[in-house]
Amino acid sequence: MGREIIFLSESSDRSTIKKANDVEIFTLDYNSHKNLQQLGIKHSTAESFLNYDERLWIFNTAKKFHDWYKDPSLNIFELKDVNLLGLLDGIELHTLLMDKLIIFWTIKKILDAKNPGIIECPYEIREIVNLLKKNNSISIKINSGEKHEELIWDTINVKHNVLGKPISMKVSRTKYNKLKNILDKTVSSTFGLWFDLKNRNKKTLLILELFPPVYKEFLQNLKSDDYNVIIINQRRPVTYDRESIKVLKNSNCKLISKNDLFGEEDEQEISESKEKYSQKLLELWNNNESFDKIFRINGISFWPIIKNNLKQVFTKRMNDYVESVFFAKKLFSKINISCILSLYDVGETEKVFLKCKNDNVDSFLLEHGFSLLFEDSKTFATLMSYDNFRDKIVVWSNHQKEFLVSNYKIQSDKILALGSPRHDALTRMSSNRSENKKFRVLIAPTPITQLQGHDTTKIHEKFEKLIIRLCEIFKNYHDVELIFKIHPSQSGHNDEIKQIIQEYSKKIPIYMLNPIAELIQSSQLVITITPEA
């Protein structure tokens, strides 16, 4: 019998770890590596078995499964010409695939190299080990309790700044939607933010998932008596923040209520459709043969390791997807929507409205980040699907336009170089730095994710050491005020970043929701930290 190997994750019980010579230990994440390092236990990081080229191959392979729902066997999930299975957030799907495929290929390479007789592993990778073990004589032990896995938007991080500290509270998607509906109803009724259907025949601009305080000047410039402006935010409520409400009010930007659009017949049809597609889902999960063919790489089906994840997410969200299709279709039929603006095209909100829009409705994708500026990152930037976007793309500069045309073969007339509605205002702001008696240094770390395959122990170590090093450097200057601005994403690495900062000093202010423009305006020096760098 071959030797024993142990896989450890953050959820593993480390009290049973053996230190025998014939046992080899592999850590699966940064925290388990740190814990063993502190205990002085010899181990290897599993990720070291994958090189950069292999991670890039996994990234490109994962992208090929983005359109899995287009398989002819899944056409039964089309509702009003929209496939409900295709409404899953593209970033969520890609992150799931990257998480699973990276660990899948890592475990495969280790098992091929070590040929163990005994495998000890955490519960969450048992399916992978069972799928990859070469014979039934291999003994498998589980070293953790059952772990409930979730996708990014299964729970919502409700965030708020309290006395300079970011406070977050996780709530379920269902509870979040209920709270959001109550908040929208109360605030919109109080401040007159509801769209008046009397104006439905006037040309209307529809804005998707844009946070008003960040785009205050942009929204103010859109204010006009000639057309309506409606904003729809599902991921981040626009009525939760006082400044957001103020911006909406001043720019005459309105919210739309589903209750104003749905009649009794609509409600009945929606209810029947929810029941119909929920039943189809129950039948779908028994169709393993079809899924084995869809989710296959190099002759190996990885369907067993993602089945439960997709089953859970669609079971939870199918009713939401059905209702969102009816809402979008009704909106386009009752209101004269002439144009759509969005920052993304892969989110659930964006997908449903872009798929449901009438052919005469123009859509504009506003550039959001810097990644396309760099030759080395152009492969990863395809997650934004610029190359597949059907309508117009608005970018910051002619340089960006030329980059898209030359690297993604996008037609030049589809790209408009108009500047950045978010960042252009910075050049016109008057600095308030003189108000600060100290030299303010703003550090803005971007959290690590597995989206591009960068979530490695080595990157986490470099990230932590860099944050601590910067804190130590500026601590020596008494006239320096150090502040941090954390990206307001759903990434779990944000909690790790906060912990690193607070363990160093609880006195350092950490911001999450404050508009970055205001923080930059009041700072003398800005330092960004990114996983890619």
Model-derived regions: residue spans:
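Catalytic-core helical/loop segments in enzymes performing group transfer/polymerization on anionic/lipid-linked
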Residues: M1-A533
